[in-house]
Amino acid sequence: MLTIALPKGALLKDSVAYFQRLGLNFEALLEPANRQLQVLSQDGRARALLVRAQDVPVYVQYGQAQLGIVGYDVLREKNPHVAKLADLGFGQCRLSVAVKASSPYRSARDLPPHCRVASKFVRCADAFFQQLDLPVDIVPLYGSVELGPITGMAEAIVDLVSTGRTLKENGLVEIEQIFSSTAYLIAHPRSYRLNLNGLGHYVPQLTGAIA
């Protein structure tokens, strides 16, 4: 049976809709009362696992899921050993540097050497500032990253931005975009090469369903 890892959160609704176009119905995952972490499609051909977005590539890399949907931001941060099959085009956002609106910094290069930058994207943030040849101290935070500058713990943050509303409501301003991100369809490399669980039958349909 084909197993698909789907991400909790913002990408779930569009991910379910994407597979529904191919006749794989996982709408049960969207029901408010749902507490199941795995569901079968209505025709019994496939199973969906509901996991944290950061864990999708882990399940796919280790073969517990043959397919998954995950944001490009997670792929950049985790660098998993998976096959990237297609950019699905939904879930648009960007990884950006932001500071307090009252600060004098208007680009990442304006930040002082050895300042603190809070982020849950530790690898991406570190790589970005290394490219700038600007030494900074990356402070790992995994919730309410915006509080870093607000409390004075960090001069800046590196975080995902969609509409910018959260930044604005917390007195922060975006000063530089690092990269843009959308949802990607990924596959377990060996399953893809060897057509395990009929994966080769689905992939042309999946990539052809992108609109």
UniProtKB/Swiss-Prot annotation:
The keyword Membrane does not apply. InterPro entries: ATP_PRibTrfase_cat, ATP_PRibTrfase_CS, ATP_PRibTrfase_HisG, ATP_PRibTrfase_HisG_short. It catalyses: 1-(5-phospho-beta-D-ribosyl)-ATP + diphosphate = 5-phospho-alpha-D-ribose 1-diphosphate + ATP. It is found in: Cytoplasm. Its main location: cytoplasm. Its EC number is 2.4.2.17. Pathway: Amino-acid biosynthesis; L-histidine biosynthesis; L-histidine from 5-phospho-alpha-D-ribose 1-diphosphate: step 1/9. Keywords: Amino-acid biosynthesis, ATP-binding, Cytoplasm, Glycosyltransferase, Histidine biosynthesis, Nucleotide-binding, Transferase. It is an enzyme of class 2 (transferase). One of its GO terms (molecular function) is ATP binding. PROSITE patterns: ATP_P_PHORIBOSYLTR. Heteromultimer composed of HisG and HisZ subunits. Catalyzes the condensation of ATP and 5-phosphoribose 1-diphosphate to form N'-(5'-phosphoribosyl)-ATP (PR-ATP). Has a crucial role in the pathway because the rate of histidine biosynthesis seems to be controlled primarily by regulation of HisG enzymatic activity. PANTHER family: ATP PHOSPHORIBOSYLTRANSFERASE, ATP PHOSPHORIBOSYLTRANSFERASE ATP-PRTASE. This is ATP phosphoribosyltransferase. The gene is hisG.
